[in-house]
Amino acid sequence: GLRRTYQSSLLFRDLSARDNLFLAVRGVSRGRFSFLRPGAASTTRAAADELLERVHLTGVADQPVAALAHGQQRQLEIGMALAGAPRLILFDEPAAGLSPAERTDLVQLFEALPAHIGFVLIEHDLEIALRVVERVTVLHNGRLLKEGTPAEIEGDAEVQAIYMGEGHRERHGS
């Protein structure tokens, strides 16, 4: 299946992180009334707890989402997108509003995604995108500017001038 995250978080803010994941797992479970089966709730809870571990949120599992840091909310969204073992996930600007430390955590989550899950990343932070994707399509003013590998894009003078600025060139020697 296909899952997605949103640029603006869509979470149940009054519920706990665990409950949000429980609902995500429940929402992709087979069978309209499968929750009536004996043991279904415990299986769903176990799957939610596994997702909490996967996105490094076990320590805040029972806190309301509203009390979580912005980066933790992004991690929770990724966990919810992973519910039901999708084949493809669309990430819409997952780094928006994250601190440098939260961006590092986000990159680690992307790097830990199972190889069988493909993803499309829409991201304004080109440095993050270049670290986690295999192919890059760069748009400028709604038009295709360049396509290529992260190395090709990072080495492109036009992309650097538009999106990365001189500071990037000085830091990375390109």
Residue ranges, per PLM feature:
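Glycine-rich phosphate-binding loops of nucleotide-dependent enzymes
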Residues: L2-S174
